[in-house]
Amino acid sequence: VVIASFANGRVIALTAAAGQPVWQYEVGQPQGRTELERLVDIGGQPLVLDSAIMVAGYQGKLALVDIRSGQEVWSKPASSFYSPAIGNGNIYLASANGDIQALRGNDRRELWVQDQLSWRQVTRPAVSGDYLVVGDFEGYLHVLSAEDGSLQGQLKFDSEGIRVPVQVTRDGNLLVYGNGGKLSVLRLEQDD
């Protein structure tokens, strides 16, 4: 099965051999009077988790969908440009307004919300051990505690901004790409 997400807020499963549709799922229904109000979009790739996918949509919801049937396992109202991140038994989501929230993985109860990065156009959170890392439109990298969302550090990386989500390598390094073309491998170190 091939999973594809689209700008119309739909996720579609296709057979790998023939590309035939198997199922489709909508993260939200367009509502409102203007085109902007009716916009429902999936900006990130669905996150594949064993027999399910997790997907978030702009002006839609965060949902876990069975990969075989396309049936919704659970959903929660949300608005995000990116797919969620998973780590430490939790779900981390950057909301469309820049707030970052943590949900407990087993019951989706909200653990914390970090609103100090509101309206900074943050990237998808990258989970690196006990920390989350996001970039923003001004080119800063922000390091947050995965446990409580508190800001732990900040680094000016690229004056032209960061739009590509930070990637975590197998050895725990951070792969960061800025809008100005700067590509770096960084390591998180805790000050004593």
Label each region the model flagged:
Residues 1, 24-48, 72-88, 110-128, ...:
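Extracytoplasmic beta-rich repeat domains
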Residues 6-7, 50, 57-58, 95-96, ...:
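Structural signature of WD-repeat beta-propellers
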Residues 16-19, 66-69, 104-107, 145-149, ...:
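Short loop/turn segments that connect beta-strands within beta-propeller blades
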Residues 12, 63, 101-102, 142, ...:
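WD40 beta-propeller blade core
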Residues 7-8, 43, 48-50, 55-73, ...:
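Beta-propeller domains
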Residues 2, 53, 91, 132, ...:
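Hydrophobic beta-strand positions that form the internal "hydrophobic ladder"
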Residues 95, 136-139, 144-192:
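Hydrophilic extracytoplasmic domains
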Residues 90-102, 109-143:
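Loop/turn-rich, solvent-exposed surfaces of beta-rich toroidal or solenoidal domains
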